[in-house]
Structure formats: structure tokens, C-alpha cells
Curated annotation (Swiss-Prot):
Catalytic activities: (S)-2,3-epoxysqualene = cycloartenol
Biological role: Converts oxidosqualene to cycloartenol (in vitro).
SUPFAM superfamilies noted in UniProt: Terpenoid cyclases/Protein prenyltransferases
Keyword Lipid biosynthesis set for record: yes
Annotated source species: Dictyostelium discoideum
Pfam family, one: SQHop_cyclase_N
Classification lineage: Eukaryota, Amoebozoa, Evosea, Eumycetozoa, Dictyostelia
Keyword annotations: Isomerase, Lipid biosynthesis, Lipid metabolism, Repeat, Steroid biosynthesis
Record-listed E.C. numbers: 5.4.99.8
Name recorded for this polypeptide: Cycloartenol synthase
């Protein structure tokens, strides 16, 4: 019997890890997620440890295993960690506000930080596979010290050595400067302004915050509040020690105004434009003479928006950065109020435990997203009817995750329509997303063919289609959460230094192709729907957009996965679903591109450096997820070179573990081009999906 102190609890998608002083028998889900057994050796009921030799055997084993690690509310839980700059915000917020994390949680966070330390130079990077930099190293160092790790601990000494040898914490990027300032370990005069008065600008101005990408908007909203108030934690003995430890000169002798644009070369990815530097200079001058009346008005206005975001998301907030900064704002405004404790309770939603320790995820999970893909993979296997309980549960989660109504006062708070949409994670989170809605629609429609499932009504699915129709941009494409509201030149104001394309919500091939697929599937189920002509026009415009952004080599640049393999999978699937002829030059070129990247072992492997450089970079080894995407693309397009496809299928069968699981390989997700993020369920979903499609397309064998 395998035992554990930790177990995952779920409730309508909410995931929380609970600690017990006494070890308890581990569930299949716990064993899978925590790797309590050697990978490939855990054998849930109904599985065996005989290696698959045929595609049909591999499909059956993959389905059997993955169905056993489904949570009791129907979703598939997974690790959505990877970024290293998130957890320190939580640790600093708890320290500043005096909120005590449980000792068991603190131990696991410390274990994670040590496990993810670069063994060569002692630093940390922007994400778990990145080179060490000042942002990552400073914030993890500070976190370890705040959590009680002494300054003379060998790993801490090694990190401090790296930090000081590379210029110290004065070269940390702006988000790091912000967190250090709130801790009282950095002077507010060393930051470029985060002008809270911007929030009073009318929406008809192109630079108004309501026109920004929602993640950018919701991060800089509470940051501007904290900057305006100069909210700062107490100057404790530990903070005084940190002031001595992380800088290359005495804290009191640092010229803080000279540090505003001091960003280490190790960190710099997106440099400030000349225009931004001029504006920052003007804002620094304004900061000295700002109107108190106007600032107080802006503070009240922004806190109202912060409160709205908290309440609409049940204190989850759109993401982990504004989650912790919002919590800090509530503490500054109200102290340890009921709202503060609602915030504190929702910290658990972001903390994820895995084999390497406890991390902060890039969202409150990827529950709906992973479940929708899993449903589609299972449906294409041809054996979904053999796993009725699993499919019923998955359908249940899809059902309870659809957003039932629009957010209140949408226009005032810059929100888009929500009714009928699907979120990335949970209905409590509730932010509608174009491709999540599309995948939800596709999954709901696919499940209608199973007679033992209570289907989601076509009226409810049509609500989702309505959201997609409102989200289409003028260029024919779809962005992520909202329409593109601002001009592209707003990117000249990007102050982040480490991310690109943060200022507005751009049209993406992934979102556009997913929406085309969803609407194409819907019109087959509802050919006489009142909006069918609009749907047809929307699909045609979307196809034109996808073709317009295809690169000369036939690929599409992925913005949410790695990278050209991912983007090209969406590009091909979108065109094929729309009815584009398979002889279309766009499809032929795309297939040729993918085939040219196949490796000697039959697989595909793409490095995250493709996203960073925007040029295809081969990984050191083939990856099961990249291989799954490439094979799905080629088979969707009926690529004529069957040998190419069969070599990929053989690679997947060889890589499958005897129990039906697949190996966790390199990081596979990305956002804003420079930061990678984990999708641990992808290793199970996409190989199974590719194997299933191969069997349906070529073998047509019963399993």
C-alpha cells in the first residue's frame, strides 16, 4: 500500500492540497500527480504492465490508465507551474501582511525552491528551464530567507554568490523592483512610475487601460494602487539583513533614481522604447508635484475595480500576480478584514504540489482546458463507450464549467460577454476565453453522440457560439479573452522588460483556428440555426486571417505552446475543419514544413527557444507532445507519406510506459514568448489522440 501525508481535494474544479499528520493510503490520482511510484510502474485497477506492441493496444492502455487518474468531479488535474516569479509574490505578500502559511506548506515551498535551483551556478531563472538571471535569483533568495532558511545555508550562499557576481539586486526587472519595494528591501524612488491617474482616462482615448490586454490591465491595476500608496512592509531585522545581503554596495549609499532603468543583461528580453523612456521621465517629474485630490480620486476608483475583480472571481482573480497584489491592496485598505481572509483562503487554489515540491501555478489550474482536449481525444479513440463512468464524469465537468451569465456592469469594468462561454479552469474563476469556449463547444458537440450521456443543450452551446461571434476581430482573427481594443503601437509602452506582446490582446492562430473548428462543428449540428449566415461569414473571414499570417516556410508561430509544431497543428486543423481543400497550397506547405522537422527516431522535438527567437529550434531529443501535434496535423490533412506518419506512431508506442502512461519530458507551454509553463496532462492527451486518429484513419480496427 502506498501512503502519503498529502492528498488532492476537488470541488467543482477547485483543487486544494490537504496535509494530514498521519499518512493515509494514496489514491490513484495522488500517486500519479505526486509520482509516489517510479514513472510507469503504478498499475491502477484494470491496467497491466505489459508493453503495447500495436496502436490498438497502446490506445487501450493509454485510455485505461488516464481514465483512472480522473478526479471525482470529472476533470483531469495537472501541474500548471513553470514560471519562477510567481511564488515570491505570494511569500512576500504573506510576510508583509503577517499572514502565516502552514508549516507543511512552507516546507514544501522550500523543497521546491531548492529542487529548482540551478546546480551549476546556484541561481534561478524566469522559468524552470531558463538560464539563471537576476529576477529569478533575487526573488527565490528573498523567499527562502523569509521562509526561515538561514543566510549561511550552503544553497543560499551559492545563490548569493551568483547574485553579487552579476551586479546584485539593483539590476532586477521592474516587477522584481516592485516586490522588493513592498517588502521594504528596495526604495520606491528606484522604480519608474506606475501612474494610478491613468485609470481615470476616458475609454475613447487609445491609451486608456480599458483597451489593454486583460492580464496586463489586471496586473497594473493593483500595482498602480500600491505604488500610489507606497504600501510597504515593516522594516524588520530580517528585512535589514536582506538589504545587506542582496546588493553590491551599502543600501544607504545606492543612488536609487539611477536604478530605474538598470536591468541586467541576463534578464532583458524586451527593451524600453525611446518613447517609453521619455514618458517615464515626464512621469517622474509629475510624481514630485502630483495633485493629491486627483490621486485620492484615482485610488478610490482603482480600489473599486480591484474589489469588483475579487468579487466576480470569488477572490481567485484572473491570475497569480494580480491575486497576490490585490490581496495586498485589500490589506492596505481594510486590514485583516473578511475580504482579506477570503483572499487568504484562495491562495490554496494556486498552490500546487508535485514530486518537486509546492509551487504557484500560472492560473488556478487548467481544468476545463485539459478536460476538453481529453474528451476529444477519447471520443476519437472509438472506445469511449467502453468507459461510460469516465465519460459521464467528464461530461459533468464540462456541464458545470460553462459560465451561466454575464458579469455585472460589464461596460464600466471593461468586461466582455460571458454567458455561454467556457473558462480555462473553473466556473468560479469565470473569465471567458475564446479558445476555451471553442474547445468546450467542440467537446459538448462530440459527447452528443454518446447515448448514455445527458447532452448539453444546443441552446446552451449556441450561447457559446454567440460569444465567439462577438469576439472576432476586424482582421478576421480571434484574440484570447477580449477583442483587440487598442492599437498595436501601444506595445511601445510595454514596461515589463521580460515579456513581449502584453499591451493589447492580439489575434492568434490558435484562438482563431479553435473558433473556426467550433463553428464548423456547430453548423453541422444546427444547419438551420438563425445565425448560420453569420457563422458562415465568420468562418470565411477566419480562414482568410489564418492564411494571412502563415509564414513563408508553411508554418504558423505558436504563442501558447511550443511552438511552430503547436501553431501549425492549429493552423491545419482550422483550415481542414472549414472545408478548405486538402490540396490547398496553405495546407500542403504546412505539411511539408512539419515533415521536414521529423527526426531520425520518427518523433518531433522542438525547443522552447523557438518561442524566444521566433525561429524553429530543434530540441535535443524527440518529445511525445510535439510528436502528437505533428501527427494530428499530418493526419488531419491526409498527408500522403504514410511512412512518415507510421514512424511517428512507432515512436509514440516505444515511448509509452508499460502501464499506459507517458514520460514527462521538457516544458511545453508558453506565454508572452519568453516565459514557459507546464501542461503535465499534455503527455497523456496528445499521444493518445494521435494514436486514436491513426487507428480510425488507417487501420479502422476495433479495440
Amino acid at each position: 500500500m502506498t501512503t502519503t501525508n498529502w492528498s488532492l481535494k476537488v470541488d467543482r474544479g477547485r483543487q486544494t492540497w490537504e496535509y494530514s499528520q498521519e499518512k493515509k493510503e494514496a489514491t490513484d490520482v495522488d500517486i500519479h500527480l505526486l509520482r509516489l511510484k517510479e514513472p510507469g510502474t503504478h498499475c491502477p485497477e484494470g491496467c497491466d504492465l505489459n508493453r503495447a506492441k500495436t496502436p490498438q493496444q497502446a490506445i487501450k492502455k493509454a485510455f485505461q490508465y488516464f481514465s483512472k487518474v480522473q478526479t471525482e468531479d470529472g476533470h483531469w488535474a495537472g501541474d500548471y507551474g513553470g514560471p519562477m516569479f510567481l511564488l515570491p509574490g505570494l511569500v512576500i505578500t504573506c510576510y508583509v501582511t503577517g499572514y502565516q502559511l502552514p508549516e507543511s506548506t512552507q516546507r514544501e515551498i522550500i523543497r521546491y525552491l531548492f529542487n529548482r535551483q540551478n546546480p551549476v551556478d546556484g541561481g534561478w531563472g524566469l522559468h524552470i528551464e531558463a538560464h539563471s538571471d537576476i529576477f529569478g535569483t533575487t526573488l527565490q533568495y528573498v523567499s527562502l530567507r523569509l521562509l526561515g532558511v538561514p543566510a549561511d545555508h550552503p544553497s543560499v550562499v551559492k545563490a548569493r554568490t551568483f547574485l553579487l557576481q552579476n551586479g546584485g539586486a539593483t539590476g532586477i526587472p521592474s516587477w522584481g523592483k516592485f516586490w522588493l519595494a513592498t517588502l521594504n528591501a528596495y526604495d520606491w524612488n528606484g522604480l519608474n512610475p506606475i501612474p494610478i491617474e491613468f485609470w481615470l482616462l476616458p475609454y475613447n482615448l487609445p491609451i486608456a487601460p480599458g483597451r489593454w490586454w486583460c492580464h496586463c490591465r489586471m496586473v497594473y491595476l493593483p500595482m498602480s494602487y500600491i505604488y500610489a500608496k507606497k504600501t510597504t512592509g515593516p522594516l524588520t531585522d530580517l528585512v535589514k539583513d536582506l538589504r545587506r545581503e542582496i546588493y553590491c554596495q551599502e543600501y544607504e549609499k545606492i543612488n536609487w533614481s539611477e536604478q530605474r532603468n538598470n536591468i541586467s543583461k541576463l534578464d532583458m528580453y524586451y527593451e524600453h522604447t525611446s518613447l517609453l523612456n521619455v514618458i517615464n521621465g515626464s512621469l517622474n517629474a509629475y510624481e514630485k508635484v502630483h495633485s493629491k485630490w486627483l490621486r485620492d480620486k484615482a485610488i478610490d476608483y482603482t480600489f473599486d475595480h480591484i474589489r469588483y475583480e475579487d468579487e466576480q472571481t470569488k477572490y481567485i482573480d484572473i491570475g497569480p500576480v494580480n491575486k497576490t497584489v490585490n490581496m495586498l491592496c485589500v490589506w492596505d485598505r481594510e486590514g485583516k478584514s473578511p475580504a482579506f481572509y477570503k483572499h487568504a483562503d484562495r491562495l490554496k487554489d494556486y498552490l500546487w504540489l508535485s514530486f518537486d515540491g509546492m509551487k504557484m501555478q500560472g492560473y488556478n489550474g487548467s481544468q476545463l482546458w485539459d478536460t476538453a482536449f481529453t474528451i476529444q481525444a477519447f471520443m476519437e479513440s472509438g472506445i469511449a463507450n467502453q468507459f461510460q463512468d469516465c465519460m459521464k464524469l467528464a461530461g459533468h465537468y464540462l456541464d458545470i464549467s460553462q459560465v451561466p451569465e454575464d458579469a455585472r456592469d460589464m461596460k464600466h469594468y471593461h468586461r466582455h460577454y460571458s454567458k455561454g462561454a467556457w473558462p480555462f479552469s473553473t466556473v468560479d474563476h469565470g473569465w471567458p476565453i475564446s479558445d476555451c469556449t471553442a474547445e468546450g463547444i467542440k467537446s459538448a458537440l462530440a459527447l452528443r453522440s454518446l447515448p448514455f450521456i445527458e447532452p448539453i443543450s444546443l441552446d446552451r452551446i449556441a450561447d457559446g457560439i454567440n460569444v465567439l461571434l462577438t469576439l472576432q476581430n476586424g482582421d478576421g482573427g480571434w484574440a484570447s479573452y477580449e477583442n483587440t481594443r487598442g492599437p498595436k503601437w501601444l506595445e511601445k509602452f510595454n514596461p515589463s522588460e521580460v515579456f513581449q506582446n502584453i499591451m493589447i490582446d492580439y489575434s492568434y492562430v490558435e484562438c482563431s483556428a479553435a473558433c473556426i473548428q467550433a463553428m464548423s462543428a456547430f453548423r453541422k449540428h444546427a444547419p438551420n440555426h438563425p445565425r448560420i449566415k453569420e457563422i458562415n461569414r465568420s468562418i470565411a473571414r477566419g480562414v482568410k486571417f489564418i492564411k494571412s499570417i502563415q509564414r513563408q516556410d508553411g508554418s504558423w508561430l505558436g504563442s501558447w505552446g511550443i511552438c511552430f509544431t503547436y501553431g501549425t497543428w492549429f493552423g491545419i486543423e482550422g483550415l481542414v475543419a472549414s472545408g478548405e481543400p486538402l490540396t490547398s497550397p496553405s495546407i500542403v506547405k504546412a505539411c511539408k514544413f512539419l515533415a521536414s522537422k521529423q527526426r531520425a527516431d520518427g518523433g518531433w522535438g522542438e525547443s522552447f527557444k523557438s518561442n524566444v527567437t521566433k525561429e524553429y529550434v530543434q530540441h535535443e531529443t524527440s518529445q511525445v507532445v510535439n510528436t502528437g501535434w505533428a501527427l494530428l496535423s499530418l493526419m488531419s490533412a491526409k498527408y500522403p507519406d504514410r511512412e512518415c506518419i507510421e514512424r511517428g506512431i512507432k515512436f509514440l508506442i516505444q515511448r509509452q510506459y508499460p502501464n499506459g502512461d507517458f514520460p514527462q519530458e521538457s516544458i511545453i507551454g508558453v506565454f508572452n514568448f519568453n516565459c514557459m509553463i507546464s501542461y503535465s496532462n499534455y503527455k497523456n492527451i496528445f499521444p493518445l489522440w494521435a494514436l486514436s486518429r491513426y487507428n480510425q484513419l488507417y487501420l479502422k480496427s476495433k479495440i
